[in-house]
């Protein structure tokens, strides 16, 4: 019962993370469900669906299809749909139903590949994990598939190009995250590639993924991109760094105001781990400037999602549910919480300082929605 939610809405599941990465790939995404998971993704977890085009299909599994595992019928539907749209690839996405009946998605991928002339990938989402696990596996599948298909020749390295890993609406809470990323990084790098989306030299989708061999640096802006960054470092010797250049100026300003009177108590930052660490580093540097660095050990990062050991500091915490979160806040002497506003629901007894830092995967709110 640790994951029982009484005050919060369900967090975005892994299949939503998969679709979020595939959304801008210029392909055709097939969600293996009866329609409910697709409706949840398009209606709640993928805000671009309302304003941008992406070919997302439900497999439309009926009871007997699920029970009997009518793979041939599903493959025929995928092939027929692929002939009706101009897609660069096909992504087959698992959900709860195929996970329960042990559908072999790799077999579906192979069967489909034999009948179409475009690349096919499959991602084993189960609906039981969170969005960042789905994103992580999708990035890995895309790199494994398209870099391998591109051959094993020694890649031609460029001098000053950067790739972005882990940038989705679910992690950034922004509808358009490429424009501010380009603005932030364009002064330092000649070209900025956002994997799974676009670049400033006209490349998009698969072509951006293939470009991953050639960049001089990767920037990981959420934990979902860390595994792929390590893979690219190991296979192609591309260095990576972690950081989050998209934080609102308002948050920095509110932190500055709070620190003027800050004397004791913990500061709890709850978000995806890379963003939360960025906020913590900012606070630590401010305290160091003011010669109050003895307070730096009071800053704690908490998350409901991935908590990587190499990015973790002593005291950081993975909340397994809202009960653990509420108990932690009740037990600790906390002077400031920086988190999505929805997280105030389980801690109605908390009356101290709070700074809103929107997390779409938790509340379904975008940054501009929250501040309007």
Give the positions of each predicted feature.
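An N-terminal assembly and electron-transfer interface module characteristic of large anaerobic redox
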Residues: 1-372
């Amino acid at each position: 019962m640790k994951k029982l939610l009484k005050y919060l809405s369900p967090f975005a599941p892994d299949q939503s993370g998969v679709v979020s990465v595939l959304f801008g790939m210029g392909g055709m995404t097939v969600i293996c469900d009866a329609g409910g998971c697709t409706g949840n993704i398009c209606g709640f977890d993928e805000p671009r669906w309302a304003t941008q085009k992406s070919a997302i299909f439900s497999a439309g599994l009926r009871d007997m299809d699920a029970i009997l595992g009518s793979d041939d019928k599903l493959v025929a539907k995928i092939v027929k749909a692929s002939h009706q749209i101009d897609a660069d690839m096909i992504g087959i996405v698992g959900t709860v139903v195929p996970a329960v009946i042990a559908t072999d998605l790799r077999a579906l991928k192979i069967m489909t590949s034999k009948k179409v002339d475009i690349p096919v990938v499959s991602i084993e989402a189960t609906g039981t994990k969170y969005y960042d696990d789905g994103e992580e596996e999708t990035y890995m599948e895309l790199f494994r598939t398209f870099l391998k298909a591109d051959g094993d020749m020694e890649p031609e390295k460029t001098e000053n190009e950067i790739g972005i890993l882990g940038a989705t609406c679910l992690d950034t809470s922004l509808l358009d995250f490429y424009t501010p990323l380009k603005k932030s990084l364009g002064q330092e790098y000649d070209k900025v590639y956002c994997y799974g989306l676009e670049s400033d030299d006209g490349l998009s989708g698969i072509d951006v993924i293939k470009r991953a061999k050639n960049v001089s640096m990767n920037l990981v802006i959420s934990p979902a991109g860390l595994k792929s960054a390590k893979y690219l470092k190991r296979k192609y010797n591309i260095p990576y760094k972690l950081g989050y250049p998209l934080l609102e100026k308002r948050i920095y300003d509110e932190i500055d105001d709070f620190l003027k009177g800050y004397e004791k108590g913990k500061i709890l930052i709850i978000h995806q781990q890379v963003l939360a660490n960025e906020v913590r580093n900012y606070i630590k540097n401010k305290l160091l400037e003011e010669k109050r660095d003895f307070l730096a050990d009071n800053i704690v990062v908490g998350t409901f999602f991935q908590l990587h050991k190499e990015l973790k500091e002593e005291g950081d915490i993975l909340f397994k549910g809202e009960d653990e979160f509420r108990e932690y806040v009740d037990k600790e002497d906390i002077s400031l919480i920086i988190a999505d506003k929805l997280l105030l629901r389980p801690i109605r007894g908390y009356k101290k300082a709070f700074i809103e830092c929107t997390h779409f995967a938790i509340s379904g709110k975008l940054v501009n929605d929250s501040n309007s």
